[in-house]
């Protein structure tokens, strides 16, 4: 029940407001008891006793009590509603802050739609609990107990007979609670799955349309939607079958009153006014019984939701800030791998990797798909931790560096470019929000993006869609590169950043990068040798191993993997030029 304690820790901030609200609920419940008494007095004293002068006063009291109750109800509803909004705001902020601290492994294991449902649907169930269920449950319990006490004060025998219903009510309540929770657990799971599927399909709509798979995705959505509908219907059928039981129990009280009350009035044990009074209190007993099923239903929704939110909140990241942080605001940029082994589950990704890079050097990384290039870069940024060996930046183990310091000194243009739904300027300035427009433009020029940006309708103020919709692959890569450059980092990482750019544009970008790379360490992951031919050292990875290392000339001399790739790529290029030249002579 740790999730309940966690929930109460948020509720504590609003305890004064909640206590005031509960006190007002208590006063309102007391006022509810007055009108049945007045109804009985009207029957006994006004109608039967013929004291007609009392009728006006009694009616004014009833009206006054009703007005005061309405005012108090409005006040305590505002107390609970404001508390619920504040609590959910705090909880959502804390949950989102927790999400921002999670590592890559967490997001690899959890789908975006699942996490979104925690922040929306589950949070709304918590809000409903605080704004409605708490006061409603408290009010119903108070009204039930007070009405029972008042019936005892009117006629003990009648009250004892009505108590016969309580054990049956308790049994039905416990039975409903036992059966409804698994049903609501399934509802929340199905909702998360549906939400995740919809989010994934919408995000990948271009692929869906490119492969004409709309009908296929619609069928999959129908299955998810059917599952959610069936889960909802199953939960509804469980709690709805208990509603008639509570109705029957409440009607039993009415039957007891009619039978016993009638005999007591005939025998002179009760007056008609007493019976009218008891009938008024009977409504107060019946109403909580009728509402019990709904309250349990809402309570189980809340418990299911808060448990799922709590699971996300209590998930500890694998990558944590070190206990004894080495503080160093500006890094020089040297990088060292010492016998690094890295694996995920049972799959070895990197095996015994060792190399050293001096500050200001440019390092090219090449290898077949799946050889471990991106994983190697991820270890420098400490997106993951090594299983054996060490990764050092400025001769400090990255596990001892402050994460913000480490990543703040690294500018990375990722292979999978992500751009926010913002202006182009906002996207480029993401890593350095305090920069000037001139700095943004300078970074764009280095990335060879300034020209196409200025040609856009609003220039740098052009709003680009989510994930850069509306831009070509090469344009997105250049904006991503400009974003990494503008951060002014000690280490720049380009993860296949120019794969969607033509060779002429790539050459222009490389020339611009050379002007700033003397004071920065640059890692370039590439499949095209032209992207790394100028590097101070080139790392060749094959199946997770560092099989070759050296300059372009040194690696060609080894006649190994690098040499093979080079001659293959440039051989194809030479053949292409030869065919084109022959075609040109033929046309002449």
PLM regions: where:
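Membrane-integrated ABC transporters
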Residues: 1-35, 47-59, 63, 76-84, ...
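Transmembrane helices of ABC transporter permease
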Residues: 13, 17-30, 61-71, 132-186, ...
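Helix-loop-helix
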Residues: 50-57, 150-164, 234-307, 312-313
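Short active-site loops of ABC-family nucleotide-binding domains
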Residues: 85, 105, 113, 117, ...
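An intracellular "coupling" helix at the cytosolic face of ABC transporter transmembrane type-1 domains
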Residues: 104-105, 121-130, 134, 138, ...
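Pre-NBD coupling/linker segments of ABC/ABC-like ATPases
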Residues: 316-330
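ABC-type nucleotide-binding domain
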Residues: 328-588
């Amino acid at each position: 029940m740790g999730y309940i304690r966690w929930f109460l820790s948020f509720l504590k901030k609003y305890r004064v407001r909640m206590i005031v609200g509960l006190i007002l609920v208590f006063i309102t419940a007391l006022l509810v008891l007055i009108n049945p008494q007045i109804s009985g007095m009207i029957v006994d004293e006004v109608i039967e006793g013929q004291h007609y002068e009392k009728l006006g006063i009694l009616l004014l009291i009833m009206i006054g009590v009703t007005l005061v109750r309405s005012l108090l109800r409005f006040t305590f509803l505002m107390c609970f509603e404001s508390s619920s909004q504040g609590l959910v705001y705090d909880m959502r902020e804390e949950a989102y802050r927790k999400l921002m601290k999670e590592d890559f492994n967490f997001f690899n294991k959890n789908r975006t739609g699942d996490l979104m449902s925690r922040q929306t649907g589950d949070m709304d169930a918590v809000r409903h609990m605080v704004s409605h269920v708490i006061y409603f449950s408290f009010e119903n319990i108070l009204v039930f107990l007070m009405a029972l006490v008042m019936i005892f004060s009117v006629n003990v025998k009648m009250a004892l007979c009505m108590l016969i219903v309580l054990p049956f009510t308790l049994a039905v309540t416990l039975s409903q609670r036992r059966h409804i929770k698994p049903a609501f657990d399934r509802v929340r799971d199905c909702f998360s799955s549906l939400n995740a599927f919809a989010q994934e399909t919408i995000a990948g709509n271009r692929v869906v349309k490119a492969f004409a798979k709309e009908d296929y995705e619609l069928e999959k959505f129908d299955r998810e939607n059917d599952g959610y509908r069936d889960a909802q219907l199953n939960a509804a059928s469980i709690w709805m079958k208990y509603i008639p039981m509570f109705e029957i129990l409440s009607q039993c009280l009415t039957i007891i009153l009619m039978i016993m009350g009638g005999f007591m009035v005939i025998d002179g044990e009760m007056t008609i006014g007493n019976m009218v009074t008891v009938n008024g209190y009977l409504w107060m007993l019946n109403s909580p019984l009728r509402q019990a099923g709904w309250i349990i239903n809402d309570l189980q929704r809340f418990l299911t939701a808060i448990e799922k939110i709590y699971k996300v909140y209590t998930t500890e990241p694998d990558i944590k800030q070190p206990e004894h942080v080495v503080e160093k605001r500006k890094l020089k940029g040297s990088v060292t791998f010492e016998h690094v082994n890295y694996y995920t589950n049972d799959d070895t990704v990197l095996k015994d990797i060792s190399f050293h890079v001096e500050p200001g050097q440019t390092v090219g990384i090449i290898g077949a798909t799946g050889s471990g290039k991106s994983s190697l870069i991820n270890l420098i940024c400490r997106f993951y931790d090594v299983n054996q060996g060490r990764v050092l930046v400025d001769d400090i183990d990255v596990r001892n560096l402050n994460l913000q310091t480490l990543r703040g000194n690294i500018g990375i243009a990722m292979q999978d470019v992500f751009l926010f739904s913002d202006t182009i300027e906002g996207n480029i300035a993401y890593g350095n929000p305090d920069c000037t427009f001139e700095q943004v433009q300078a970074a764009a020029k280095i990335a060879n993006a300034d020209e196409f940006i200025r040609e856009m309708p609003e220039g740098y103020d052009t709003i680009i869609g989510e994930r850069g919709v509306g831009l070509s692959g090469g344009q997105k890569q250049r904006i991503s590169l400009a974003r990494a450059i503008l951060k002014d980092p000690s280490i720049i990482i380009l993860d296949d950043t120019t794969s969607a750019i033509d060779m002429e544009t790539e050459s222009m970008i490389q020339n611009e990068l050379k002007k700033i790379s003397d004071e920065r360490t640059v890692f370039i992951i590439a499949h095209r040798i032209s992207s790394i031919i100028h590097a101070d050292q080139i790392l060749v990875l094959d199946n997770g191993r560092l099989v070759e290392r050296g300059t372009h000339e040194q690696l060609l001399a080894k006649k190994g993997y690098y040499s093979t790739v080079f001659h293959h790529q440039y051989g194809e290029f030479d053949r292409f030029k030869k065919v084109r030249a022959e075609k040109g002579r033929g046309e002449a």
